[in-house]
Amino acid sequence: MSAPPNVNFSATLNGLNQTVTATQGLDVSDATGSNAGWNLTATSTTFATGGGPTLATTSTTVQSGPTRACDSGSSCTLATNSVSYPYALPAGASAPTATKVFNAAANTGEGNQTVTVTWSLAVPAATVPGTYTSTWTISLASGP
């Protein structure tokens, strides 16, 4: 997997609960020939301003299964995913144990493909204005 692009959420606080979304394309390449499948796992730190205010550790989710497509000009066997949604991205002051956000069952996921995840971020009405950041770790491992 190549380094995933950053995810940027943007919200204008208006005194109401909001959900903002952002997409992230994850380029996955499995040329092992093992047909063992693979897992994308993720974890994160809590969204914080650095000055105190934070968002809930359950604020980032994936509401429905990511889309997937073979990369242009390549041949692939699209991944068959068994992860249930909605998915909550684990978060904590120190990133907790990563969990599966997407997987390829055995005999699927061979070749080059892009898995596109639509992340949702819950922004409560009482959110203190500021720039919130979080560090995410997304990993690719062999096996169903």
Predicted features and spans:
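Signature of Gram-negative chaperone-usher
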Residues: 1-144
